[in-house]
Amino acid sequence: MKTISLAIIALMLCVQLTKAQSRILPIDTTVTTKHKLQTNKEIINYTATIGTQPVWNEIGDPIASLHYTYYTRDNIDNRADRPLVISFNGGPGSGSVWMHLAYTGPRVLNIDDEGFPTQPYGVKNNPYSILDVADIVYVNPVNTGYSRTIPAFGKEVDRSKFFGVNADIAYLA
């Protein structure tokens, strides 16, 4: 009897954990903040905008929420002449986090030469960021980072719309 009771409790916990994993995300939001970056050459003032953008189906219903981070260098006279880098890793499984926090972003993980975290843990200025020469958008494909499909009326979205080279081109273009 004790084993059955424990099994029932374990099952109930699993159901609750599954419910905790399903979250409702707003489909169109932004948050903007201002920052400074010390590079090897100069101090760069920049704006960071993170947000989500809806992906629409053929009849105009939102079917996914696409997460992005957008960095723009401040005090640029003609933004139309400034290069824009759009960076994303392939999903599912890996969002743009490694491009963002390991290579081109204005802040990088505090790690040693072999890639192990060093104290104090966290992030530090990236003196090699490309923000001095180009604005950057990091995009998380659907089911990576905070990008998710949006089930409508209890029905799951057709996942074939998001997984594959041609699918990525279709919904990201």
Where do the language-model regions lie?
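N-terminal cap/lid subdomain of alpha/beta-hydrolase-fold enzymes
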Residues: 60-163
